[in-house]
Amino acid sequence: VRAHGLSTERGGIQNIITQEPSVAAYAIGSGAQAASTVFVVDDDDSVREALQGLLTSVGLRSRAFATAQAFLEYDEADTGATASCLVVDIRMPGIGGLDLQSRLVQRRRVPPIIFMSAFGDVAMTVQAMKAGARDFLPKPFRDQDMLDAVCSALKYDEQMRALEKSRESLEERYRSLSDRERALLQMLGDGLMNKQIASRLCLSEITVKVGRRQLMQKMRARNFVQLIKMESLIRGLDSQKVRASYEGGANEVAYRLESAIARVLHE
């Protein structure tokens, strides 16, 4: 196994790049991963060059930045159309890795982050992982360990993007409903019978039945059970707890809800 073990003694400005015998090309899991981008943020030129060389050797695209500020400026203008992950040195002059992670959380969903450091301690690792980091690699590290971490992060980002598309699809369907249709959907979700709904909305039962059929069409539900599941998920999206979770970046609550949405929409 070939290793780009990278360690940096900043006090003595001594960079060590160890290499073992090379290996066969690392297999990328999917075409989607090959089209993904790995962002490298490290103030050490040799580290950036070594990582970009490693990623290029297995067919992965990368962009490197010497400072977190430079990445933030790029990220603000980037549309983020394809899956990506971030490989970041946790200790850098100016904005450090943990601070960068915090700033990204404030902007939007954070891409999977792989932290690396020659100086990382247990407390720092715990802080990074609690904030949502995917991995933490100490320098020096093996090429294979970095590639495994990167490919795992890219696969995770692809999955999260697919889940987000399912959520956006459900929200788009719900936005297409009129106020009365939304009220009808909520009452159906509450378990009310057609007669009860007709009484509350001052409608005939026939009109309620027609409204149900229209709801099925607009929500693209294949059956009534699926429609009720969609209504339950919409309530979850509207809850303050989940809304707060999106504002704070990806977390377990949002992930479980989006996974449920994806399952229901593909039933």
Name what the model sees in each region.
Residues 34-47, 51-55, 68, 86-89, ...:
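Conserved acidic segment of CheY-like receiver
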Residues 64-85:
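Acidic, metal-coordinating helix/loop segments flanking the phosphotransfer/catalytic sites
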Residues 66-67, 93-100:
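Acidic catalytic/metal-coordinating carboxylates
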Residues 73, 98-109, 127:
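Short amphipathic alpha-helix used as the core "switch/output" element in two-component signaling
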Residues 121-123, 137, 141-151, 196, ...:
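C-terminal output helix
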Residues 193-226:
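Recognition helix of helix-turn-helix DNA-binding domains
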Residues 214-267:
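Basic, Lys/Arg-enriched C-terminal extension of HTH/homeodomain DNA-binding domains
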